[in-house]
């Protein structure tokens, strides 16, 4: 069973394990590595509305949110198993609108399109790659 639960301070070591992995960072706008000390400060100051993705109560990834923007990172050991798709479906089920940014060459773009996200024409260049915005307008 897959579910989303709010991120807690105790989840930060797991979050860093996923976030600081090179295979995750290559697809993030800010690809810096973070320390636990930096992450604790961030968590305590911002109280983010992020969610841990659990499969049978085992953490496999997380959903990032910032207002209407959403993103998802899955631990490298659990990718290509459909967890991101289900997590997005759970997160989006009650949403009228969401947006995200994705590198145009990121294979996850196909997933976003299947979920109903469409490109809106906004793009920027980051590290010589095209970073595009996609929007979801409910179902």
Q: Locations of the language-model features?
A:
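A short, well-structured alpha-helix characteristic of acyl/acetyltransferase catalytic modules
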Residues: 1-33, 37-41
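Conserved beta-strand-loop-alpha-helix junction that forms the acyl-donor binding cleft
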Residues: 99-113, 117-118, 124-130
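Short hydrophobic/aromatic beta-strand or adjacent loop that forms the aromatic wall/cage
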Residues: 48, 129-134
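A conserved beta-strand-loop-helix scaffold within acyl/acetyltransferase catalytic domains
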Residues: 61-68
């Amino acid at each position: 069973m897959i579910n989303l639960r709010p991120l807690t301070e105790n989840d930060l070591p797991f979050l860093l394990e996923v976030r600081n992995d090179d295979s995750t960072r290559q697809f993030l706008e800010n690809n810096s590595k973070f320390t636990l000390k930096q992450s604790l400060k961030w968590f305590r100051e911002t109280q983010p509305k992020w969610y841990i993705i659990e499969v049978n109560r085992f953490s496999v990834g997380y959903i990032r949110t910032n207002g209407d923007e959403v993103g998802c990172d899955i631990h490298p050991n659990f990718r290509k198993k459909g967890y991101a798709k289900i997590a997005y479906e759970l997160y989006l089920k009650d949403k009228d609108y969401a947006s995200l940014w994705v590198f145009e060459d990121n294979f996850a773009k196909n997933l976003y399109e299947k979920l109903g996200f469409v490109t809106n024409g906004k793009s920027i260049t980051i590290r010589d790659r095209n970073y595009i915005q996609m929007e979801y307008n409910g179902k």
